[in-house]
Amino acid sequence: MPLIIGIDPGSRLTGYGIIEKDGSKLRFVDAGTIRTETQEMPERLKRIFAGVERIVKFHGPTEAAVEQVFMAQNPDSALKLGQARGAAIAALVNLDLQVAEYTARQIKQSVVGYGAADKEQVQMMVMRLLNLTIKPQADAADALAAAICHAHASGSMSKLTVLNALGGMARGRSRSSSRRR
């Protein structure tokens, strides 16, 4: 059964989420954040790299999904986000994982059925799809959503499974949910 790690990169908080995929079923394994908010940028990147590496070595995922950088209005923020993303990807690749990349819109479309969903909607759908009783922290939920998106994109999850998990929330959006990659 594939074990998928999702990464939501950030220069202060990098979210990670690990799920197990068994056919059309998903199981929560672990989620959290790598905190780097008090260090200078080189130390932050080191901490992201080491944190991702430690998590991968502990859990042994077989697949990885990382959220792509969006172009922020602030070029400095976009640069820092790109550096954090690079540190996370380098750690994954250093441990021989292939990395799938998805835009935030693709992830939201796959998980919520709506590419412009807000963070609260993503958190609620992650809870529903993984049968969680406690709402994950936003960065961890985004990382879990990236892993779920990858599970859907890898072809082992059927559209029907996702729509069943959505329940009443899928009404009116089922056609758009089929356009995920």
Curated annotation (Swiss-Prot):
Superkingdom of this protein's organism: Bacteria
Catalytic site positions: 8, 67, 139
Molecular function in Gene Ontology: crossover junction DNA endonuclease activity; DNA binding; magnesium ion binding
Chain residues that bind Mg(2+) 2: 67
EC number: 3.1.21.10
Biological process terms in GO annotation: DNA recombination; DNA repair
Principal subcellular localisation of the protein: cytoplasm
Any Gene Ontology CC annotation: cytoplasm
Protein name: Crossover junction endodeoxyribonuclease RuvC
Organism, as annotated: Acinetobacter baumannii (strain ATCC 17978 / DSM 105126 / CIP 53.77 / LMG 1025 / NCDC KC755 / 5377)
